[in-house]
Amino acid sequence: MTSEVIVDVQTKEISIALLEDKRLVEFQKEGRSASFVVGNIYLAKVRKLMPGLNACFVNVGYERDAFLHYLDLGSKFNSYTKYLKQVTSDKKKLYPFSKASILPDLEKDGSVQTTLQQGQEILVQIVKEPISTKGPRLTCELSFPGRFLVLMPFQDKVSVSSKIQSAEERARLKQLIQSIKPKNFGVIVRTVAEGKRVAELDSELKLSLIHISEPTRQEAIS
């Protein structure tokens, strides 16, 4: 079976079509919003290091800088940093996570001063929306939730929701996902995946990978 994904990016919306043997099997259309909501991913710029807080302020294009603590860089920050350099070196070429190198984990007791530099560009995801006078709260440990699955780059583990109580079903889902998941991705199987066929899960997985290869990228304002 030959799979093909077509992505049409317009000013106000993005359309994604999944074809199998030239036959349309799934179609999605999403609006492009400028709102800073939880889950959005941005190419941000470090604005100010705060050694006393072991944190920094980051510009994601919002009127107020976002807050990023050292611990929210995540264990795979080194891998994300190298990946971003490879992606930005040739913006016309897609560089999937599955082809990226996994570097040693970031030290848990490290500091922003030795890890980040003012003006450095980083990939971030919003985990808390702006409130009143505060900007968004960020993480660099990206996750991509779908209806059935949550994908996590540079991980490898497959976990099944604890709400799926059947040992047989948990084993089935774990074995199934391990057989179809791409390299360099960890997966969390959500409760609603219980009883789903491999075709349904594989279809969502393929569409999720397209979203991941073209993340929302809002250039930080210098």
Language model segments and positions:
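Short, ordered, surface-exposed loop/turn motifs in non-cytosolic proteins
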Residues: 221-222
